[in-house]
């Protein structure tokens, strides 16, 4: 079974680049995942692809079954989770169209299922929540491909589904670089399960801190569609470079706090 999972939107599943082998829709202790998991190959590498927001039942960010999603991928044997997502920019130098390989997150969500340990005290350690090994793999690929990217970025995760007010956006600029709605709790659930996690984020807009700019879903979709090829190229180059035992830090962190 695949050791690598890719979580993203419809565009990532491209019949021209994704060789479909089978579809599975497993049950988990937390219900069904957000969609069927597509098992196939990208650049000759076997992967499990999951549409985070679903295709038959549309899940807004607050309602995504994050626990079921990560659990299902773990049960399929995945060790590595690569998230492809859209983000807004909170800093001038993070320009729409840029790729960001995030290295930290700040959590401003409010009503999600954050842990698998509701009946047990487990304090997961995530000082560095994104896998340094995976980040380094995709940094090398981005560099090789000549893509405009940022190695490192503080991802601020808001509840959604609404976008920020201008006051919020100005406040967020004081401590974050990019803003989105999906990394939390996906990232920390992966850590609880001992899976490595990285986020390949495409900047689609400047949020609303620029007085003449505003963000809407059409703008996000338009920019994401225009830049999708960069994400696909990054996956095609980076996935074959991921080694089976490339990282032990993430699983050791989960074991160290009693999560595994």
Question: Could you tell me what each predicted segment is?
Answer:
Residues 129-174:
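Active-site rim beta-loop-alpha module in soluble metabolic enzymes
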Residues 208-258:
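His/Asp/Glu-rich mid-to-C-terminal helical/loop segments that flank catalytic regions of hydrolases
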Residues 181-219:
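Zn-dependent metallopeptidase/amidohydrolase metal-coordination segment
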């Amino acid at each position: 079974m695949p050791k690598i999972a890719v979580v993203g939107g419809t565009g990532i599943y491209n019949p021209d680049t994704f060789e479909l082998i089978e579809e599975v829709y497993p049950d988990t202790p937390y219900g069904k995942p957000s969609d069927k998991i597509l098992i196939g190959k990208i650049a000759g590498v076997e992967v499990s692809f999951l549409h985070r927001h679903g295709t038959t039942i549309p899940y807004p960010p607050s309602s995504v079954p994050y626990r079921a999603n990560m659990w299902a991928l773990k049960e399929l044997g995945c060790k590595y989770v690569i998230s492809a997502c859209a983000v807004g920019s909170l800093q001038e130098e993070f320009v729409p169209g840029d790729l960001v390989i995030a290295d930290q997150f700040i959590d401003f969500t409010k009503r999600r299922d954050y842990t698998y340990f509701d009946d047990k005290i487990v304090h997961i350690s995530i000082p560095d929540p994104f896998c340094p090994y995976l980040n380094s793999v995709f940094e090398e690929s981005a560099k090789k491909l000549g893509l405009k990217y940022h190695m490192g970025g503080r991802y601020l995760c808001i509840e959604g589904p609404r976008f920020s007010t201008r006051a919020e956006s100005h406040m967020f600029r004081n401590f974050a670089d990019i803003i989105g709605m999906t990394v939390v709790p996906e990232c920390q659930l992966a850590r609880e399960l001992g899976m490595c996690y990285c986020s390949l984020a495409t900047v689609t807009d400047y949020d609303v801190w620029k007085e003449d700019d505003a963000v809407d879903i059409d703008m996000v979709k338009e920019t994401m569609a225009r830049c999708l090829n960069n994400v696909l190229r990054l996956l095609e180059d980076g996935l074959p470079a991921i080694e089976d035992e490339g990282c032990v830090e993430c699983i050791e962190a989960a074991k160290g706090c009693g999560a595994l």
